[in-house]
Structure formats: C-alpha cells, structure tokens
Amino acid sequence: MIWLWSEYFRAIPHLQQSGVLKNFALETEGDFSGQYQVVAKRYYSPDRRVIHPAAPVVGHFNDLAYVSNIDLLLAKDVFSSSEQAKTVDFEQTQRCYQFQLASTSPLAAQQVIANTLNISAIAASEQIAQRLRRVKAGQRIVLRGEWVKVRSVSTGQYFQINHYPLPANNCRIVRVQQHELLGAKATEFP
C-alpha cells in the first residue's frame, strides 16, 4: 500500500522549477500534437538519490529523470479502438518500448510502429505536471507541445532514449504545453 501512495504523490519536475533550466538545455525540433489513448505510464528515478530533483546547483544532475521522470506509451485513436490492438503485448524497458505480436495477430509489425508512440514527457508548468501525474492507462487524451532535444548544461551531452531497433520517431522527448482529458475510458489493452 505504501508503494501505491508514493506513486500517486510522486513529484514530476517541470520547467518553472528554478533548478531544471539551470541544469538542462532544451532545443525545439518541431511541433507535437495529437489525440491518443494511453496504453501505459511509467515513472523513472535518477540513478542516485538527492534531496530535491530541481536543486538550483548547476552541474550535479546529469540524469534525464531530473527533467523528465514520466514516460507515456500512446496509441493513435483508430488503432487503440480496434480489436486487433488487443493482440499486441507491450513492454517498456529503459525509456522506450518493445512489443510482441500474438501468434494469432492479423497485424504486421509496421502497423504497430505506425500507430504507437513512446514519449518522455517534460511538463512546461506545474499545472501540466499535475495533469500528467493523474494520467491513467486507458484514458483518451489530447497533447500539444514540442519535440525537443535535451542537453546537460554541465557536460554538453544530449540524452538519448531510443536504444532499440524502433524508428527514432517512436521514442522521443516532448515538452508538453497542453493536456486535455477526453470522455470516458476507451478499450483496455491487455
């Protein structure tokens, strides 16, 4: 029970916290928007523990989890509402996803890749961070923001989240500027 409460009240960093932009630089790559069903949500923690993830000290926080500690696995509405979607088993490893098709699945791997997306979300504000924290699998949402590249200010290193054979566009970092919850829960994924 304690774990559930800690997940429910987990803090999500956002760009209005003083230490976040002192330690990370964001470079916009383009606009992002879409209507999706949330397949899964996963939290990440940095490799080492500190008192506060957005400390104003520059250079001590070289882990992407200090600016983005939540990933969302999303499916396009057309795909998520189909019975075929239930024949796909998703697994999130590290900061990206992998999938396995059931032997009876009529889908091809390319169809799954074309209709799914894993984002490492960066909240633009405290309000967006609170909304992202409340997101649940099965909900239909609209997200708007920007594709971004994240660089550590102290090392100059860019953070990569896609270490798998999926196309680079399927696992990306997004600065979320707007979040809207739509209607009731849609079809559940297995």
What is the meaning of each model-derived region?
Residues 1-190:
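OB-fold and OB-like single-stranded nucleic-acid-recognition modules
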